[in-house]
Amino acid sequence: EVQMAWFGGLSGVQARRLVPGSQAIAQGLEDPDFKSYFIANTSTGLSPSETLTDAFVEQPSFTFGSKGSTSGRLMPEFYLREAFNQSPDQLFEKVGFSGDHSATIALVQSGAYATGAVNYKVWERELEEGKIDTDKVQVIWETPGYPDYHWTVRGDLNDKFGDGFTQRVTDALLAIDDPVLLNAFPREKFIPASNDDFAPIEDTAEAIGLLDAQ
């Protein structure tokens, strides 16, 4: 039985629905303003833009990351639907799910897919590590910010471990300042979070059919 877990935005919402009473207690400093990058192979001729353009969805193929990823599927699909009022399957001849962000970058860089969507932190890390050839793949559009990764605990921790236990766990997370520990996530530091912070994720998942409406 898991008492506490580090979730992405969507997986956290799903977990809290499965375990009523569970609480989001902390998130990374960066997480209230998380982003996805829409990327394209340079052979498409697409250029960076302030908006998603018709030229982007005129490309033949698009790949998400994991089907359950907030930054690699949920929010990118939301913004595609918002911009063009159609599902990805209606917009592109071929829609794929790479399984993870690194694979998405590799598939678009190789030309296996013309376009894709990735977690911005993975892109920035791999760019810094020299794994991305910007002569072959580039960022075309950046989404608005949205909430994502966070810590969630079961709602019965105080009953099992004593009054105030959940708050002590929260305080311990917020107090972490060891660079090695923080870099494991990687986050600059942790800040408070609540279930309400992730209402936009839940609403979006319901709107595109990934969650049943409550």
Task: For the regions a language model picked out, list residue spans one by one.
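Periplasmic-binding protein-like
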Residues: 28-37, 131-173, 183-200
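Short, glycine-/small- and polar/acidic-enriched structural segments
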Residues: 1-47, 120
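Hydrophobic residues within well-ordered alpha-helices
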Residues: 1, 55, 108-109
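Short helix-initiation/N-cap motifs at beta->coil->alpha
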Residues: 7-10, 87-106, 147
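A ligand-binding cleft/hinge motif common to bilobed small-molecule-binding domains
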Residues: 6-19, 81-82, 109-110, 114-134
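Ligand-binding cleft/hinge of the Venus flytrap
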Residues: 53-59, 70-97, 124-133, 207-211
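A conserved helix-loop-strand patch within extracytoplasmic ligand-binding domains
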Residues: 28-84
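Ligand-binding clefts/hinges and TM-proximal coupling segments of bilobed small-molecule sensing domains
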Residues: 58-82, 167-214
